[in-house]
Design a protein with these regions (language model features):
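C-terminal membrane-cytosol helix-exit motif in multi-pass small-molecule transporters
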Residues: 178-198, 224-236, 253-268, 477-487
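Flexible interhelical linker loops that connect adjacent transmembrane helices
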Residues: 9, 185-224, 266-281, 342, ...
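Transmembrane-helix bundle of Major Facilitator Superfamily
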Residues: 2-191, 337, 344, 352-358, ...
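Intrinsic disorder in cytosolic terminal tails and internal cytosolic loops
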Residues: 1-14, 196-211, 451-454, 482-510
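Alpha-helical transmembrane bundle and helix-membrane interface signal
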Residues: 135-136, 194-198, 210, 234-248, ...
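Membrane-interface helix termini and inter-helical loops of multi-pass transporters
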Residues: 45-46, 232-243, 309-314, 369-371, ...
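12-transmembrane solute porter fold
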Residues: 16-31, 36-38, 51, 168, ...
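Short, membrane-exposed interhelical loops at transmembrane-helix boundaries
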Residues: 445-461
């Protein structure tokens, strides 16, 4: 009995050691993504470039991560998730150091590309490794703990960056990333077991003499091109008109590349992403509601700083403290939601989460110039709680609908839906507010709104339209969440698609 308890305790300890090793890398990578927003002005001044040019520091990161995440997830499923994780940490650290040493802005952007490749590798495998380390009946707890870690990293980024930049140059922020990355690498090398984190049928098995499937280079290329076209079109870094020939060509390119990707994947015996997953109502509805949820969440975080500073007159430090409430609510709710979903199932929690999400968005749509700050703070905290409540069980439902050997690419696809939701949410909020203001004669930078009472009124009109739009999207996500019926236990095996659907090539059963 004592020996049995000892083994159980050691298994529990190994599980949490592996989680901590992965969590350190998650915190560092997410921290790096949010800290850079605070440093953009300093970077622009140092290199003597415009704020429009320095925005590529962020854009190139979104492009590379979004384009490479699914291919990296599939590669990890084939060659081993631990390998991809460790190589990603090395690339991320090398890119961070190269950013500091870059003598020109162009080389600094190239270094950011290297960082983003490492970040994509880390995001692609992190979720899958955590789910693989924990037993199926603790999947919610695992994802809840992961989401809390992400919330911590996201919240720490702008706060720490603000303090550091008061005393040190912007390069110090990237040097700060190196010590935790070293710790994450050593911990990952020591505590991550490839056979455990890759699971049965993944890369670990390839070393034992099992046949390794061919990598779907065509699918990876087409998906990367389609996602790159989508991110560039929606983010519109060149500020071209939405009816301009450039924009029309971009939209056509998105449609053509997406159709080509789907056609290609359906014809492959070993596709990068099994499109048959979408025949599962649980998978397809959970993925759609997840994307809609992140569109609404990003709209909040994009417009809220402008509202707090330009409309309510808060200082930057106070604004950061108010915005922290969203991350606090998400972190607290995610941890509890994960544990509760293991006991009571995913559906009640993500239905409740989307309901609260829609309520808080509707409340934010009603805000004006004369509002008590505590009302704003309560709505932001509630929005964070909602995000924590629906995010974790929603992810658990998605991962629970696919076989374990596909967790890498599906975990990467989950993170991709978050990134695309973020891009779409920011684009929607910006397009609505800027469009309404321009229609009222205020074609000015958002940072200069507070100096003009008429501009404030126009901004608030656009604000209400934008939040009304994302409230509608959140209600749609709530309806999908209500219809989602996650299946407990292991997912059923995938049935092959009819030969007619794949041009006569029948995919190999998985």
């Amino acid at each position: 009995m004592t020996e049995s308890k000892g083994r159980a305790a050691e298994v529990e300890a190994q599980k949490w050691r592996a989680f901590i090793a992965i969590a350190i890398s998650f915190v560092t990578m997410v921290f790096s993504m949010t800290m850079v927003f605070v440093a953009l002005s300093a970077i622009a001044d140092d290199f003597g470039v415009t704020l429009g040019a320095v925005s590529w520091v962020v854009i190139v990161q979104s492009l590379v991560i979004s384009a490479l995440m699914m291919p990296m997830g599939r590669i990890a499923d084939m060659v081993g998730r631990r390998r991809v994780h460790l190589v990603g940490l090395v690339l991320f650290a090398a890119g961070s150091l190269a950013v500091v040493l870059a003598p020109t802005f162009e080389l600094m952007i190239a270094a950011r590309v290297v960082m983003a490749v490492g970040n994509a590798m880390g995001q692609a495998v992190g979720t899958a490794m955590i789910v693989a380390v924990f037993p199926a009946n603790e999947r919610g707890k695992a994802l809840g703990s992961q989401t809390s870690v992400v919330a911590i990293g996201a919240a720490m980024g702008p706060i720490v960056a603000g303090f550091v930049l008061q005393a040190l140059p912007w390069e110090a922020l990237f040097l700060m990333l190196l010590p935790p990355l070293l710790v994450a690498f050593v911990a990952g090398y020591r505590y991550l077991d490839e056979a455990v984190v890759s699971g049965a049928g993944a890369g670990a098995g390839a070393d034992a003499g099992h046949a390794r499937p061919d990598f779907d280079w065509g699918g990876a290329t087409l998906s990367a091109l389609a996602i790159t076209a989508l991110v560039l079109t929606v983010s519109n870094p060149l500020a071209v008109g939405w009816t301009s020939p450039t924009m029309v060509v971009s939209v056509v390119a998105i449609v053509v590349l997406t159709a080509a990707f789907i056609s290609w994947e359906l014809r492959q015996p070993e596709p990068m992403l099994q499109l048959r997953f979408f025949t599962s109502p649980t998978f397809s509805m959970a993925v759609t509601s997840r994307t809609l949820g992140f569109v609404g969440s990003t709209a909040v975080m994009f417009l809220m700083p402008i509202y707090l500073i330009s409309v309510l007159g808060l200082r930057e430090a106070s604004t950061g403290a108010v915005l922290f409430l969203t991350s606090l609510g998400m972190g607290l709710a995610a941890n509890q939601a994960g544990r509760s979903s293991d006991r009571f199932g995913e559906r009640p929690l993500f239905v409740a989460g989307f309901a609260i999400h829609a309520f808080t968005l509707a409340g934010l749509a009603l805000l004006g110039q004369e509002v008590a700050l505590w009302v704003v703070m309560a709505l932001l905290f509630g929005n964070g709680v909602a995000l924590g409540l629906w995010n974790v069980p929603n992810g658990s439902a998605i991962l629970g609908a696919v076989p374990s050997e596909h967790l890498g690419v599906v975990g990467a696809f989950m993170n991709l839906t978050r990134n695309l939701g973020n891009v779409l949410g920011q684009a929607l909020a910006s397009a609505v507010v800027v469009g309404v203001m321009a229609a009222r004669g205020f074609d000015i930078p958002l940072s200069k709104i507070g100096a003009n009472p008429g501009a404030v009124t126009a901004f608030l009109h656009g604000w209400r339209i934008a939040y009304a739009a994302v409230t509608v999207l959140s209600v749609l996500a709530l309806a999908l969440a209500w219809l989602t019926r996650p299946t407990p236990g292991s997912p059923p095996p995938l049935a092959p698609l009819p030969a007619s659907a794949v041009g006569g090539v029948r995919p190999r059963p998985t």
